[in-house]
Structures are given as structure tokens and as C-alpha cells.
Curated annotation (Swiss-Prot):
Pfam families for this protein: GMP_PDE_delta (PF05351)
Domain comment, as recorded: Adopts an immunoglobulin-like beta-sandwich fold forming a hydrophobic cavity that captures N-terminally myristoylated target peptides. Phe residues within the hydrophobic beta sandwich are required for myristate binding.
Entries under InterPro entries matching the protein: Ig_E-set, PDE6D_unc-119_myristoyl-bd, PDED_dom, PDED_dom_sf
Domain of life (superkingdom): Eukaryota
Function: Myristoyl-binding protein that acts as a cargo adapter: specifically binds the myristoyl moiety of a subset of N-terminally myristoylated proteins and is required for their localization. Plays a key role in localization of proteins to the primary cilium membrane.
Protein name: Protein unc-119 homolog B-A
Bias type Basic and acidic residues, positions: 1-20
Gene source species: Xenopus laevis
Ranges annotated as biased composition (Polar residues): 38-48
UniProt key word Cytoplasm: no
This protein's UniProt keywords: Cilium biogenesis/degradation, Lipid-binding, Protein transport, Transport
Family under the similarity heading: Belongs to the PDE6D/unc-119 family.
Amino acid sequence: MSGSKREAALTGQPKDERKKSGGGVINRLKARRVQGKESGTSDQSSVTPFREEELLGLNQLRPEHVLGLSRVTENYLCKPEDNIYGIDFTRFKIRDLETGTVLFEISKPCSEQEEEEEESTHLDASAGRFVRYQFTPAFLRLRKVGATVEFTVGDKPVKSFRMIERHYFRDHILKSFDFDFGFCIPNSRNTCEHMYEFPQLSEELIRQMTENPYETRSDSFYFVDNKLIMHNKADYAYNGGH
């Protein structure tokens, strides 16, 4: 799966007004850069290469560090407590933009449910940082896909919120998105939809990705003011229905 363009609509409004309509200003944003071998736009010549082992030894990671990675990470490059801004992703939806069909949707439980779950179970420190997706092979042939994400912000203002998302198949990079959320006000609920336009994948690559579930993986790195504060992971299978 590879991408050639990504756009977003970002809406921010205070949490206590999230049920009201018309409370936020909508900004339409574009990714600063998209890379991907399938799209013919992969140019790493100006990027300094880094190994994961090198980055694990650093106290502070910046965007140029993760852009220099040539393979998916095996470890998390920051701790959950590094998210000092209280950024919390509460809803995620993937849809086919051409038909409007919802392909995947997940929402975080409400506060009351979370409290009950925390009392009854011991949560792993990495809970919520990893997602596993399963799609049918037809997903790899979609041309336009929208990914809607909703997140809340804590008491601190978030300056220059940025996400770098890198997708790999068998440790070969498929695509890399570099996306600016911009400024988020304190105690706000924000929604954005990333609109991906995918070029046509080769039949051989589609076959390999379908026959090898969960060997397609991704790293999502989140930065505030150029400092890494969150790192999420995902893996993907495209053999649904088989």
C-alpha cells in the first residue's frame, strides 16, 4: 500500500462543548512530504540514516531521527509518560472515499467504562499503543481512503503537533507520511480526516502482502515542538474473507 497525497480537515473545540455544533474552526492541511517506493517519490538522499539501537540511546528524539530509519522498529522509542500534554486518541475510522463505505471503526470506552476496566484488570504499559488491522485483499486496490481520527488535549497548549507515519512490508519501506496538525488549544477535542490517494500497486506486491499477513507494519511517531512524545505501532493483514 503506497500513497501519493494526504490532506486533512482539523477541527478543535473545548471538551465541554463537544456536543455542540459549529464550535470549531476547520483548517485544511496537506502533508509536507510523502515518500513511497511504489509511487516513485522515495528520495532518502538528503536523510541521515539511523539504526534503532542508536536512537534508543538518545534522551530526546527529533523528526530527522525517525526519518532516517530504514526498517520498522522492534521497540517503542519513547515512554507513555513522555506524553506530558495528555493527548488521547478516542476514535478512529477508515472509509472508502469513493463509496463512503466504512471499512474500520473503533472508539475508546467512555470514562466510566475505563474506570471499571482499570479496577478489574491490570493494564500493560503498552496498552493502547498497538493496533492490529485485518482487511480483505480488495483494500489494496482502493484508490482513495479517508482516515478520521479524534483526539483530546490536556491542560497544556500543544505547539507544532506533527505526525510521521512510516509503513513497511518485510522491512522495506512502502510509504512515509509527514503531517502537521499545527497548534491545539488546551482542553480541546480535535477531529481530522486524512485523505489518501493510493497509486496502483503491482499485482506481485499485492499477492505477497495478501499471502503474508501481519508482515505489513507501521510506526506512527508524534512530535510536539519537534520532540517525540508518542510512538504507536500497527500491523496489517489483507487476507480477510479467506
